[in-house]
Amino acid sequence: MASIAYLGPAGTFTEGALLQMTDAGMVPQRGGGDWRPLPVDSTTAALDAVRDGAADFACVPIENSIDGSIMPTLDSLAIGTPLQVFAELTLDVAFSIAVKPGRTAAEVRTLAAFPVAAAQVRQWLAAHLPAAELRPAISNADAAQQVADGLVDAAVSSPLAATHRGLSTLAEGVVDEANACTRFVLVGRPGPPPARTGADRTSVVLRIDNAPGALVSTLAEFGMRGIDLTRIESRPTRTELGTYVFFLDCVGHIDDDAVAEALKALHQRCTDVRYLGSWPTGAVAGAPPPPSDDAARWLAGLRGGAADGSAR
């Protein structure tokens, strides 16, 4: 039975994303078709559980539409034993303001919130609960648990976490920006990537020599092959001031010839290339890499003795 670590306790948005992934059959089969949830107290702990062998996979948030990338996830993927992404799911996110039954907004003096959640409802809180003292929580479910335990008056929480703990809500669908969403990924130990679907994402972490034009030359390996880069982000190496690694996402799969050629070029050009995987996205988000069949046939023609590269 496969085990999947996730940011717990029960009722987090991460658990909701994990349930949707498993229902959709997005989890690779390891040890049979059943799986066991393993709630942990941070995204870093979830990824470390995979590295340590305590879990087969981890479901972790990697990006949200309000604040961008989830830095603890990126930093953990960039260092330590390599891990690989096998699936992703984007979840619409809206929060509930959870309280004990019978409590009113006028009685709310303290409010618990996971920092990522607090950032997404900052304007709403300023308008509706301006006097509430904000207290940290390690997850949306933990915020709800603090209400249930009587530690705070209210919580910014997921609807699922509030329901699990028998709480009422002062407001539902709370979010500063309409259509807010979070992208979650399923991460495991390295293995064969999911099959190419035509709507795929490939991600790498690069260490590049500190030399003039090094980054431009690296990015050119994608541009010259018609590969659409969808994310470029730098993070400190944590080993020396002023040194960085670069996260790059592109449209395409390692089995696309253009992407494969770019990866080979990166291996030759960069100090280090960490392959984070190629996996389906469900929908094409950008321009897919161009097919190289025509070029391959032309080259085969030349090898066969045709002066113009035409097949003989």
Task: Indicate where each model-derived feature is located.
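Domain-level signature for soluble enzymes in the chorismate/prephenate branch of the shikimate pathway
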Residues: M1-R312
